[in-house]
């Protein structure tokens, strides 16, 4: 879905009109979040966000898996498989599955790390354990009560924060903010903005860990596009941030097209983009997630689509590493309720 503009402005008459619906939605979500989950038999680290839409969870999940491997863990990512038709539980195989099967994000991640897709997270956790997982990294699911979470790590964009602070549909929040903050163990703020500062202060006051990070362009991607003019397109939660990252990397973005998150590109849309690129002498560039979703259709265009990859760089990685180690050891010695 494409987020309404009023979600990211001070509360307006429209958001106030929708507040009663937001109150009902918030009550339902709060009730679900308070339910007791099932122990997975291994530590569960949840990478989530407070609001609908993108915040940088996928690059955070991949960065977290890398750190956990450095700690001699065998993490497996557990995903709901949004946008995919398979209910699972299933271990994603990029050679057999496509985005229509398992969703774009799980497919993209599975090219680097083991990923289990399951609508039922308890069943997914069981499969991951049978595949040798020493711990589970949940990509999203902060508001889902199915599994006991031993560490909840929230990702937030420094420019967007929590928007107008209202619960859906009056705003972008998935649940009332105080309850979500109460259940947050660590916060990763992506970027240099100040929109998340109040949330960070609230979490720090409760003893939570607050870290800064930034999205860093992949060096090979930058080198591949050096000296080229590009037409960039993206169907992700925050296309503007992606385009800004391209420009900050020195890429000459001559044209850009933003689509809704998880947008199902049609052949006609792709052909139109390719025709514009050919006419203007531009190189087509998109995200790894979008390219995973486009799949084999890209081969029919007659124009190459270049993926521009980004990774998450945490400013104080040693502190995050130590925090993870402490929380994992605690989870193994003292199970967490709820």
Curated annotation (Swiss-Prot):
InterPro entries: LpxK, P-loop_NTPase. Pathway: Glycolipid biosynthesis; lipid IV(A) biosynthesis; lipid IV(A) from (3R)-3-hydroxytetradecanoyl-[acyl-carrier-protein] and UDP-N-acetyl-alpha-D-glucosamine: step 6/6. It is an enzyme of class 2 (transferase). It catalyses: a lipid A disaccharide + ATP = a lipid IVA + ADP + H(+). One of its GO terms (molecular function) is tetraacyldisaccharide 4'-kinase activity. One of its GO terms (biological process) is lipopolysaccharide core region biosynthetic process. Its EC number is 2.7.1.130. ATP binds at residues 51-58. One of its GO terms (cellular component) is plasma membrane. It comes from the Bacteria. Keywords: ATP-binding, Kinase, Lipid A biosynthesis, Lipid biosynthesis, Lipid metabolism, Nucleotide-binding, Transferase. Transfers the gamma-phosphate of ATP to the 4'-position of a tetraacyldisaccharide 1-phosphate intermediate (termed DS-1-P) to form tetraacyldisaccharide 1,4'-bis-phosphate (lipid IVA). PANTHER family: TETRAACYLDISACCHARIDE 4'-KINASE, TETRAACYLDISACCHARIDE 4'-KINASE, MITOCHONDRIAL-RELATED. Belongs to the LpxK family. This is Tetraacyldisaccharide 4'-kinase. It comes from Rhodopseudomonas palustris (strain HaA2).
């Amino acid at each position: 879905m494409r987020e309404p503009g009023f979600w990211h402005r001070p509360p307006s008459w429209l958001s106030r009109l929708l507040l009663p619906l937001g109150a009902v939605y918030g009550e339902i979500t709060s009730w679900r979040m308070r339910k007791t989950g099932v122990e997975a038999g291994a530590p569960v680290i949840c990478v989530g966000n407070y609001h609908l839409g993108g915040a940088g969870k996928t690059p955070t999940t991949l960065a977290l898996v890398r750190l956990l491997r450095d700690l001699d863990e065998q993490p497996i990512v557990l995903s709901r498989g949004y946008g995919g038709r398979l209910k699972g539980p299933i271990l994603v195989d990029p050679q057999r599955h496509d985005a229509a099967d398992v969703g774009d994000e799980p497919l993209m991640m599975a090219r680097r790390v083991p990923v289990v897709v399951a609508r039922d997270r308890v069943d997914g956790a069981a499969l991951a354990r049978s595949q040798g997982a020493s711990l589970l990294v949940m990509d999203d699911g902060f508001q889902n009560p199915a599994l006991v979470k031993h560490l909840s790590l929230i990702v937030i964009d420094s420019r967007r924060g929590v928007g107008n602070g209202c619960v859906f549909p009056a705003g972008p929040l998935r649940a009332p903010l105080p309850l979500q903050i109460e259940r947050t163990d660590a916060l990763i703020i992506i970027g240099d903005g100040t929109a998340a500062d109040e949330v960070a202060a609230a979490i720090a006051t409760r003893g939570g860990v607050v870290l800064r990070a930034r999205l860093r362009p992949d060096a090979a991607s930058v080198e591949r596009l050096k000296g080229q003019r590009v037409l960039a397109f993206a169907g992700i939660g925050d296309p503007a941030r992606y385009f800004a990252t391209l420009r900050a990397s020195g890429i000459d973005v001559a044209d850009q097209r933003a689509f809704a998150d998880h947008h199902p590109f049609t052949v006609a849309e792709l052909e139109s983009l390719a025709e514009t690129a050919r006419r203007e002498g531009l190189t087509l560039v998109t995200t790894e997630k979008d390219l995973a979703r486009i799949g084999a259709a890209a081969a029919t265009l007659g124009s190459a689509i270049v993926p521009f990859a980004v990774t998450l760089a945490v400013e104080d990685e040693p502190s995050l590493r130590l925090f993870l180690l402490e929380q994992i050891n605690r989870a193994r010695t003292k199970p967490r309720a709820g």
